[in-house]
Amino acid sequence: MTKKEIAKFIDHTFLKSNATHADIKKLCDEALKYSFASVCVNPYYVKVCKEYLKDSPVKVATVVGFPLGATSMKTKIFEAKEAFEDGADEIDMVINIGALLEGNVDYVYEEIKNIVDIARGYKNKIVKVIIETSELSDQQKIEACKIVMDAGADFVKTSTGFSKSGAKYEDILLMRKVVGDKIKIKASGGIRTYEDALEMIEAGASRIGTSSGVAIVSED
């Protein structure tokens, strides 16, 4: 797979707390230059990105319940509605990890389903669900993937990039085994090189979340 082909898999990401308008403009310019799938930014910058990227195929993604997943369901619902109204094409939401660990699968399902239902009220909106694989056992990863599928989301995503570790090849293989072709997988966290990205794609990822997109597609 060429670097130009890999670029189509990349969500070009800048989720740092110190992001400025200049940083976001640069992010968008890079996404346009390299034809990345999307830019992924904090909600404050959704409108800005939508304006920068108008009339381009680059999508605008943002986050909900990020990075801990521990905000209330009502808060996540509000964040999702606001994001879509501001022009977001895609949402990366974090599940309530504690609820999953306690076995409260109904709550986790309901939370995701609410966001999915909001997305379906618009045209061509995507919901990706972050399960934070570094916090889960293999059995919990399997359970989380099944909940995400049942709730009707478009993607299950490995990581926020803010936890103990990010995407692992073995996790992508496991997740692909569970979800098959029913939903897609996004790998994120610690993907910094062309080799890292290619490994995740070969394992079954359809999208790569990284702040190293330019380095990945520009390596000699």
UniProtKB/Swiss-Prot annotation:
The keyword Metal-binding does not apply. The keyword Lyase applies. It comes from the Bacteria. GO terms for molecular function: deoxyribose-phosphate aldolase activity. Its EC number is 4.1.2.4. The active site is at residues 92, 157, 186. Belongs to the DeoC/FbaB aldolase family. DeoC type 1 subfamily. This is Deoxyribose-phosphate aldolase.
